[in-house]
Amino acid sequence: IGHEIGHGFDDQGSKSDGTGMLRNWWTAEDEANFKAKTGALVAQYNAFCPYDDGETCVNGVLTLGENIGDLGGLSMAYKAYHLSLNGKEDKVIDGQVWRSKNREEAMRRQMLTDPHSPPQYRVNGIVRNFDEWYEAFGITPDNELYLPPEQRIRIW
């Protein structure tokens, strides 16, 4: 649900006002900040290249709306989960829902045409921007997915 709510504020949904009218309602500063953050997210996803050819990579522009939805969705779900605990100890919830196995041809086609990032990047590309993930799993700079705090993206 959080992912779908996030679409209301992604690269497309953010172009409509609160009544659904297509108009620019952003201040110049807010729009510049949004573009800087989404540009950084595009760059992160453009760097996900599952094959050694260096040519078949996730298209960060094509997948931007879905990646924003995933990023916002995780943040909303995490906050809602902690509210539901009412002070009780939390349990670790992982990303197994996105486990998959794809043939190379299908994966290459997906990266050219599908606005959704491949499953492993829908998980790894999002959690590496989420400070709470580092705390929950003790992620340190020697981990492959580690991003320095100043490179982590939080749009909302």
Task: Set out the residue ranges of the language-model regions.
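Zinc-dependent metallohydrolase catalytic domains
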Residues: 8-156
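Short alpha-helix carrying the canonical HExxH Zn2+-binding catalytic motif
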Residues: 1-9
